[in-house]
Amino acid sequence: MLLALSQMHVEPGQPQLNLSRAEQRIAAAAATLADIVLLPEALDCGWTHPSARELAGPIPGGEACERLRAAARACSIHVCAGIVERSGDHLYNAALLIGPGGEILLHHRKLHELDFARALYTCGDRLAVARTPWGCIGVMICADAFVEGLGISRTLGHMGAKLILSPCAWAVPPDFAGPYGQLWRDSYGPPAREFRLTIAGCSNTGPVNAGEWTGWQCIGHSLVTGPDGGILGQAAYGVEQLLFIEVPM
């Protein structure tokens, strides 16, 4: 199965621009015959950006959701992407797995949001897997991978997932000197080995300009860990990239 990771630039508070970029990346992935394209966390409004209070929409029916569904359908490709969801008085940091006909196969709400981000997002309360032509796929979002005991990824493994897709927003402070990525290798490797599954995390690039991490930069460096816990591929640091990885399923 050919997986594309769309390490795209996200401009906080600019959902129209960001969704147009996402549509372009989906089309580019499909043109290279990828089976699934994975995009970043909160790609519409940007992670923790307060514009979501005005701009986020429902799932299904909101503009971000429906444009991603239309792109998947137009390109006949599976799409996994993170967007902000409005449900009643609550906002959720959400992710969708969308089938090539535009159908929503899986809808995940981030369970393990950082403390300061909970002023904006309500945490989710459930996990699921979706059955696809390549087997079961699970979805988590970024810091979901950090739950004590790596419980979320391990639970998805117990539920039969052979691939876990994780929209992310990996950010570093202005004085960060690198290297970056060991915390993700440490989080992805053990459950990947234990359950013989693949975990893919796709981060955006671009600034964080709201909340406690104002001034930080999202740096990409997206990562795919294989069933032996080794690295199947990693994208560049700090730049946009469309990375293609053959995933064993």
Name every feature range the model reports, one short phrase each.
Residues 60, 86-163, 167-168, 175-190, ...:
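Active-site catalytic loop in hydrolytic enzyme cores
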Residues 7-13:
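Short polar catalytic/cofactor-binding loops
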Residues 41, 83, 141, 168, ...:
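A cross-domain feature marking catalytic cores of carbohydrate-active enzymes
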Residues 15, 20, 24-100, 107, ...:
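Cys-nucleophile CN-hydrolase/nitrilase-fold catalytic domain and related Cys-dependent amidase chemistry
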Residues 6, 55, 108, 130, ...:
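Hydrophobic residues at beta-strand termini and immediately following loops
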Residues 1-5:
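Extreme N-terminal starter segment of soluble prokaryotic enzymes
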Residues 60, 64-80, 146-240:
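CN hydrolase (nitrilase-like) catalytic-core segments centered on the catalytic cysteine
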